[in-house]
Amino acid sequence: MEQSFIMIKPDGVQRGLIGDIISRFEKKGFFLRGMKFMNVERSFAQQHYADLSDKPFFPGLVEYIISGPVVAMVWEGKDVVATGRRIIGATRPWEAAPGTIRADYAVEVGRNVIHGSDSVDNGKKEIALWFPEGLAEWRSNLHPWIYES
């Protein structure tokens, strides 16, 4: 089953949005496989966003991510990466579809509440980076109520 890395950023944590964000993924039928509430070290943030290191906003992004605790999660389910991106909404909140997390809770791109894997391959890399110890092994009893097979 496909997995995606989802991170509630410091602004989402500070604003008390953790429960609502988790609820949106659960209500869709995805399964939480790993979760950490943590402060991110500068070097770790730089590693996570290494693909953006040549962008002018990179230093500010790193400062933002290390400014407070984040909630790092792994969600599992059919097409969880693409569907998760639709639940999250466009990076620029003003372009996000109504009802998405960013449309509902974000105003500026630099405080857009949440990060989600943008591809299955990047999801695998992000999960390996954030959860090197592995994930909980379990299968929800709800699985047959969500998936046909």
UniProtKB/Swiss-Prot annotation:
It holds the Pfam family NDK. It is an enzyme of class 2 (transferase). The active site is at H115. This is Nucleoside diphosphate kinase 1. Its EC number is 2.7.4.6. Its cofactor is Mg(2+). GO terms for biological process: CTP biosynthetic process; GTP biosynthetic process; UTP biosynthetic process. SMART domains: NDK. It comes from Oryza sativa subsp. indica (Rice). Keywords: ATP-binding, Kinase, Magnesium, Metal-binding, Nucleotide metabolism, Nucleotide-binding, Phosphoprotein, Transferase. CDD domains: NDPk_I. Belongs to the NDK family. One of its GO terms (molecular function) is nucleoside diphosphate kinase activity. The gene is NDKR.
